[in-house]
Design a protein with these regions (language model features):
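GIY-YIG nuclease catalytic motif and its immediate N-terminal context
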Residues: 1-130, 134-219
């Protein structure tokens, strides 16, 4: 029998896939749920390999969260975008002179006062554009409805842990050319996931996977 990591990939590879632009498909994206992202060139056991799992905490925010990742050019609102930017910088130059400034967060008033004058706005805009192009050209996703915050966080954690534990055991491996291999974050490099939270916790068991299957299929 296939491992749960394989079964997870088979389950999500069989669902309706969305790519950018997805505005026309807004009515097919549940208001509350979990997204599963795939990346071109990444495969596992004959399937497209899952490279990120995510959700939202506020009510009715799934579509908005996807837009923050795919469209809105502001890495301070999307750690996913920030991590892709980190990898692009280090792919360009392992000791990129702008890498430290890319970490600055100017979302708060304090952050603006402390860091805004240090930033190269044109460089950041150009990098944000590169991030958007990378995401829009290379990533696709599936979604499934999970109505409550607690359930979303539970299933997100179980799925991430199942995948990362399989990576830790050597079952899942990123391709040699995976952009995440340039990440300064060891967790991203080792897990093969654009994630640093919920890694290596409790994996799904068989009973939970059956429940998840029904949830994904809308039963």
């Amino acid at each position: 029998m296939n491992s749960l990591a394989v079964q997870l990939h088979q389950l999500f590879n069989a669902q309706k896939r969305f790519t950018f632009p997805f505005e026309a498909n807004k009515n097919e994206i549940p208001t509350n749920g979990i997204y599963i992202i795939f990346e071109k060139g990444e495969t596992f056991n004959g399937c497209d390999r899952i490279i990120r799992v995510g959700t939202h905490t506020g009510d009715n925010q799934l579509y908005s969260r996807l837009k923050q990742h795919f469209v809105k050019e502001n890495k301070n609102r999307s750690i996913f975008r920030k991590n892709i930017g980190r990898s692009l910088l280090r792919k360009d130059d392992p000791h990129h002179p702008y890498a430290e400034k890319w970490e600055y967060d100017t979302t708060s008033r304090e952050g603006k006062q402390k860091y805004a004058h240090l930033l190269d706005v044109n460089f950041e805009k150009a990098l944000e554009k590169r991030i958007s192009e990378y995401i829009q050209q290379n990533l696709s996703f599936v979604v499934f409805e999970v109505k409550t915050k607690d359930d979303r966080l539970f299933w997100e954690s179980r799925i991430i842990s199942t995948l990362s534990n399989a990576a830790k055991a050597g079952e899942i491996k990123p391709s040699e050319n995976w952009l995440g291999s340039y990440s300064p974050n060891e967790k991203i490099r080792e897990s093969g996931l654009w994630l640093v939270n919920e890694l290596y916790k409790q994996s799904l068991n068989d009973e939970e996977f059956e429940k998840l299957k029904n949830l994904v299929k809308g039963k």
